[in-house]
Amino acid sequence: AALRTARLSQARRLIARHLQDPHLAPAMVADLLGVSVRHLHMLFEAAEKSFSQTVTDERLKQSRRLMREAPERLIADIAASCGFESLATYYRVFNAAYGMAPGDFRARASDGL
């Protein structure tokens, strides 16, 4: 169990390190960890979120942080720097997660809400 927890932590750190890569995939992380893709998926299944959900959540958190810290940056630039391959996908995923468009989030953040 301790080894599983350590590997999951390593996997999460690798995800964080490679978030900006739109091709971040289980095979890449599994290879860096020295485990099979199946084993990697099993690590995440035992946790609360799947690999892909973890990647998406981390990308969204990073994009929100960047919108707060760099309000002058274009949303398209932020989305790309967080690893979203298309702006349409970013808007769809952001809206599904937070119930608002990224621009609305940015406006609220700048109003101090």
Task: Go through each PLM region and give its residues.
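Key DNA-contact positions within bacterial/archaeal DNA-binding proteins
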Residues: 38, 87-88, 103
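Short hydrophobic/aromatic patch on the recognition helix
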Residues: 40, 89-90, 94
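A secondary-structure capping/hinge motif
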Residues: 44-51, 93-105
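Residues within the alpha-helical elements of helix-turn-helix
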Residues: 32, 81-82, 97
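Short glycine/serine/threonine/alanine-rich loop segments
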Residues: 35, 84, 100
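A short, Lys/Arg-enriched amphipathic alpha-helix from helix-turn-helix/homeodomain DNA-binding modules
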Residues: 1-24, 30-35, 53-73
